[in-house]
Amino acid sequence: QDGVERITSLTTFADLGALPHDVSTTATPPDIAPLDRCVSAASSPEHVRRMAPLMQRFDLRFDPDCIGWAHGAPNGVGSMRAWMRLADGREPDVMSVLMTLDSLPPTTFALGMPGWAPTIELTTHVRARPAPGWLVVQHRTRNVAGGMFEEDCEVWDSAGRLVGQARQLAMLPRH
């Protein structure tokens, strides 16, 4: 961009269909409010929608316990949970899982630190092809230090399978 390298990428691809189908995990889907109790991102205040235009590509329904920040009352817990599907009605696929891994506002919003949080490093894993239907996505941070925070993400499909994971290191938003 303007003659300056802004991003580098290292990617590894595999055939998900060639992987064994056995699953042994202690991971469990997040505790999220039922879909009909969640709040559509489309009802977000205009300033929030302007900050995150990517959200318009999804039908996002936020767990009401996670969105106090949108109304000036962050809950102080570094976690966001939402139901997600593509806005155009397509069923989820591997590419939409990748997009979902970085689709929610930074968890720093819930900590009372809204704003752009530049990514330093992002690692993503697509674990399986998703089943049709809504995806559940959860972002969490456990450590804010040195002007940075880590954010872990999990994406679960409608069959209750963990289909995507990510870890991101980002800079704190500037106030």
Where are these regions (language model features)?
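Terminal targeting signals and extreme-terminal segments of soluble enzymes
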Residues: 1-175
